[in-house]
């Protein structure tokens, strides 16, 4: 207690209430029966300070009552520390992330096509699995020091099953909400589960596209298509309405080539909108620019390329290793889709395969990195020692990174975080982690004239400015942690690691796919970055056309920088719930217009209960989430 009081005095703690957390001896401890007697004895012996056993809520309620008006208001991101473990099981993290987006789509499409059908129990079960995979209790205390024990394996089996079940449940729900197929297998319906109009590539399986290579819209206009080397059929679905569908027809005619073709020659991939160059020796992207612009948006000053594989053993970043010589092979020659396969040897892997894809007319390039990971070294003395010993804390540590150095003069980096956008350093609170940062869907680097939006679909951690996630084991010395992030346009996707000494996985092995996208652009637009990223993670869904006409779009949200992040049937089955997000960061007056009927709408919250009646527009603050409930008439 003397040391604690000294610490309060050192920092000039100005309040007369403090909160001390006691969780027993170690985390996840059982209640401590000695605590009550200790507090009783202390209060009887000493006049000051007095102790009260309380819950967190009680303690902070007492603090707020006495000092609420004196507490300073702080704004910013308290970037966390524990999330490094998501990279210790990259495949399962990917499964859970994808399942969350798939489930969001299933709920929206269910509200569009069968709003009176209740799926609440199954939806809640799927979300429960997603949340329990994301929850911090990853595995056994000896997961690194004794990784092959039944104790460790059984706990990991339980944890992994949450991701497996989330994946299977979300797939089943998405399949179940889709309209039943009609009798015309040559007609395809393309469904949009988001609140903005979409123009995107759709890929049909060989079986689904057996009717032919030529594609027409419902009005008879031909659209660009291409039979891929895999047997699949790719075509561009134009003007798929928000929360609606568009119908396309296949026939035996010749595929229509786009007006401006996508090409690949001499290492250069271009489509009249975007141009990228792949280095033949390394397979890295060494140039990227918008058509008509001279600025190369890839920073080559340190010899790195974009999407470069980097492998770090232990903590010395000067010893980082690159992939071996690349073999570059064209898989799709265009004219609609160009795809290049880049195969390399890679330290820490059995193989590394990277793919770069560009679609005619699209303003971005897609990257797919397939890592066939080798298993890290196991503890040579399993069962001896524990998470605090040398092996668990410092030995056989490794990580996989992909580099993204951008050349945007005086560019500001912005990171998508839950319901906000964060600038490293500038928007971080004191005490925030600066060695690694979680990312939702995208990072943008831009100045007033141009920039790049980077999207990650599977890997949720980045290192900013350099490889800075090299804190092995339990680093308790605060002076070892990074204190500042200087302005930079360079970052690294921290895809895999085994750095922590307990709970998280000791190793990963076999195949994991990491997907990214790069979109060069003009000035920064936060809402456009979110639309782009959500569009990739919640793609258009194609089905064999249903009987009858295409359903009318359900509703329209205005303005375009207010996004509906959620559309679902209410849990009670009596209405529809919409969650509107102020994606521009600026206050907007939003309007929801229903295409058929005009249901009564109320402000609501997570309870989905009716609040204040909504007439006309609703105010949506920047980065705010506003929930509306609409009851069917």
What is the role of each PLM region?
Residues 1-178, 193, 451-543:
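Catalytic grooves of carbohydrate-active enzymes
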Residues 4, 171-633:
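C-terminal (or distal) subdomains of carbohydrate-active enzymes
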């Amino acid at each position: 207690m003397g040391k604690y009081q000294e610490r309060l005095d050192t920092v000039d703690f100005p309040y007369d209430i403090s909160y001390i957390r006691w969780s027993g001896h170690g985390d996840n401890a059982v209640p401590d029966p000695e605590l009550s007697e200790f507090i009783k004895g202390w209060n009887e012996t000493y006049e000051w300070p007095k102790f009260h056993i309380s819950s967190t809520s009680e303690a902070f309620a007492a603090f707020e009552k006495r000092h609420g008006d004196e507490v300073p208001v702080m704004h910013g991101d308290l970037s966390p520390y524990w999330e490094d473990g998501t990279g210790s099981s990259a495949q399962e993290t990917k499964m859970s992330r994808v399942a969350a987006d798939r489930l969001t789509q299933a709920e929206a499409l269910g509200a569009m096509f069968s709003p009176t059908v209740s799926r609440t129990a199954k939806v809640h079960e799927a979300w429960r699995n997603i949340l329990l995979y994301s929850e911090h209790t990853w595995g056994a205390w000896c997961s690194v020091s004794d990784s092959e024990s039944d104790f460790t394996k059984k706990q990991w089996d339980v944890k992994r099953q949450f991701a497996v079940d989330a994946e299977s449940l979300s797939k089943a729900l998405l399949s179940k909400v889709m309209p039943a197929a009609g009798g015309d297998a040559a007609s395809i319906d393309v469904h949009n589960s988001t609140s903005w109009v979409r123009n995107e590539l759709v890929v049909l399986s060989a079986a689904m596209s057996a009717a032919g290579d030529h594609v027409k819209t419902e009005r008879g206009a031909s659209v660009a298509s291409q039979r891929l080397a895999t047997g699949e059929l790719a075509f561009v679905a134009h003007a798929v309405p928000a929360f609606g569908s568009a119908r396309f027809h296949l026939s035996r005619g010749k595929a229509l080539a786009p007006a401006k073709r996508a090409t690949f020659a001499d290492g250069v991939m271009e489509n009249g909108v975007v141009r990228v160059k792949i280095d033949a020796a390394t397979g890295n992207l060494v140039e990227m620019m918008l058509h008509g612009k001279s600025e190369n948006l890839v920073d080559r000053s340190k010899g790195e390329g974009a999407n470069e594989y980097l492998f770090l053993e232990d903590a010395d970043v000067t010893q980082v290793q690159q992939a071996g010589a690349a073999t570059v092979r064209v898989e799709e020659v265009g004219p609609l889709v160009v795809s290049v396969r880049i195969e390399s040897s890679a330290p820490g892997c059995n193989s590394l395969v990277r793919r770069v894809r560009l679609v005619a007319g699209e303003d971005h390039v897609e990257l797919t990195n397939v890592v066939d990971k080798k298993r890290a070294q196991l503890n040579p003395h399993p069962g001896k020692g524990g998470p605090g010993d040398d092996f668990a804390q410092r030995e056989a540590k490794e990580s996989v990174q992909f580099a993204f150095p951008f050349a945007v003069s005086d560019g500001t980096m912005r990171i998508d975080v839950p319901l906000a956008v964060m600038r490293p350093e500038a928007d971080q609170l004191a005490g925030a982690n600066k060695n690694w940062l979680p990312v939702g869907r995208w990072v943008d680097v831009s100045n007033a004239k141009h920039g790049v939006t980077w999207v990650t679909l599977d890997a949720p951690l980045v290192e900013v400015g350099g490889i800075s996630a090299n804190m092995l084991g339990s680093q308790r010395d605060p002076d070892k942690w990074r204190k500042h992030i200087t302005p930079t346009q360079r970052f690294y996707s921290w895809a895999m690691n085994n750095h922590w000494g307990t709970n998280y996985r000791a190793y990963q092995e076999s195949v994991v796919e990491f997907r990214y996208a790069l979109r060069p652009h003009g000035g920064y637009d936060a809402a456009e970055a979110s639309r782009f990223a959500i569009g990739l993670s919640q793609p258009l869904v194609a089905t064999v056309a249903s009987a009858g006409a295409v359903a009318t779009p359900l509703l329209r949200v205005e303005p375009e920088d207010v996004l509906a992040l959620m559309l679902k049937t209410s849990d009670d089955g009596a209405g529809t719930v919409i969650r509107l997000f102020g994606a521009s960061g600026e206050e907007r007056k939003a309007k929801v217009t229903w295409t058929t009927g005009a249901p009564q709408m109320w402000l609501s919250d997570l309870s989905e209960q009716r609040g204040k009646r909504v007439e006309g527009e609703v105010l949506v603050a920047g980065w705010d989430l506003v929930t509306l409930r609409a009851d069917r008439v």
